[in-house]
A protein has these predicted regions:
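N-terminal export leaders
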Residues: 1-7
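Hydrophobic h-region of N-terminal signal peptides that target proteins for export
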Residues: 10-19
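Cleaved targeting-peptide boundary
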Residues: 18-31
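Extracytoplasmic/secreted envelope proteins and their assembly/folding machinery
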Residues: 38, 45, 49-53, 92, ...
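Structured C-terminal subdomain patch of bacterial secreted/periplasmic proteins
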Residues: 39-40, 140, 237-304
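A short, structured surface patch at a secondary-structure boundary
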Residues: 40-94, 98
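Binding-cleft/active-site segments that stabilize strongly anionic ligands or cofactors
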Residues: 73-129, 169-271
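Extracytoplasmic substrate-binding proteins
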Residues: 118-186, 213-214, 277, 282-304
Length: 304
């Protein structure tokens, strides 16, 4: 069944929150507050939660808080944010008790809308769409969310500052860097490698960096690749983004394919803390900052 397939998708290790849908859809038209009070927002989507925090708004409730902390890293969720359970199966009774003013979802969570709309107005915000420019889509989504919480001015500042700061970071990077191969481990022999339509590539483009992965990608901008496929990539710098599954780091230290990859032998692998690879503008800033700092430290020979 379609619904079962959707649940399996969300219950996978990443629980991808994005959708290739190109249009935002709502079950209720946004109503402006007479006193412009910030509405109490619940969401099952981490990118929406991240965007709210970037705008200075703490969400009332978020799905799968513990996994958010592992995969998203920053911005940190305040301790008073209520965990409403799995993003694919939020605790509806708890949500009803919280009485949110609005519930925000991505199109992937559309099967939840009929039941969630009995609790509060539900609005779906499209975040990822391979048919449109990702950077523009994320800007539009940020402004849409900002309008709902009366933070349009803050959103405009956030977006302007991001574009300015990325340009400044670009100027600080070492010259003549090799292409980068950005991955997240699935197990000791398979990774997600990020290419076209990914947040990571969108940031790299704005930093003037080349992506070594030119293979096909899915709607969220990654391919699942085996380490053997990297044997055919002659020159690239490996960048590994946390989290790494339990036990994988230890197995990679053992003699095996990883240790014999030319990409691993020719230069130290760059490791970055967790960044939500399907995130919004704040994830874009975090990735840009972490990557540029890692490249600068490496150029100085400082790998501590």
């Amino acid at each position: 069944m379609k619904r079962a397939g959707w649940l399996l998708c969300l219950l996978a290790p990443l629980g991808l929150q994005a959708s290739p849908a190109s249009q935002s859809a709502t079950t209720d038209t946004a109503r402006p507050s007479e006193h412009t009070q910030v509405p109490r927002i619940a969401t099952v989507d981490w990118t929406i939660a991240e965007t709210l925090l970037a705008l200075g708004v703490t969400p009332l409730a978020v799905g799968d808080v513990s996994a958010y902390r592992a995969w998203v890293g920053e911005p940190l969720l305040p301790a008073d944010v209520v965990d409403i359970g799995l993003r694919a199966q939020p605790n509806r009774e708890l949500l009803a008790e919280l009485k949110p003013d609005r519930i925000l979802i991505s199109p992937l969570a559309a099967p939840l809308a009929p039941t969630l709309s009995r609790i509060a107005p539900v609005q779906s915000i499209a975040l990822y769409d391979p048919q449109t420019d990702l950077w523009q889509r994320l800007h539009e989504a940020t402004l849409t969310i900002a309008a709902l919480v009366h933070k349009t001015a803050e959103a405009n500042v956030l977006l302007t500052d991001l574009n300015r700061d990325l340009e400044q970071m670009k100027q600080t990077l070492p010259a003549e860097l090799p292409p980068l191969l950005v991955v997240q481990f699935i197990d000791e022999r398979h990774v997600r490698v990020f290419g076209r339509h990914s947040l990571f590539e969108a940031v790299m483009q704005r930093l003037g960096l080349r992506n070594a992965w030119q293979g096909e990608t899915n709607a969220w901008g990654f391919s699942v690749a085996s380490l053997e496929q990297f044997l055919s990539i002659p020159e690239a710098r490996l960048v590994v983004v946390d989290p790494i599954p339990v036990g994988v780091s230890e197995r990679l230290q053992e003699p095996g394919l990883w240790q014999h990859l030319p990409l691993v032998q020719q230069a130290p692998v760059l490791h970055l803390p967790a960044v939500w690879s399907f995130g919004g503008v704040l994830a874009a800033r975090r990735f840009a900052t972490l990557l540029s700092e890692a490249l600068q430290k490496d150029a100085r020979g400082d790998r501590q």
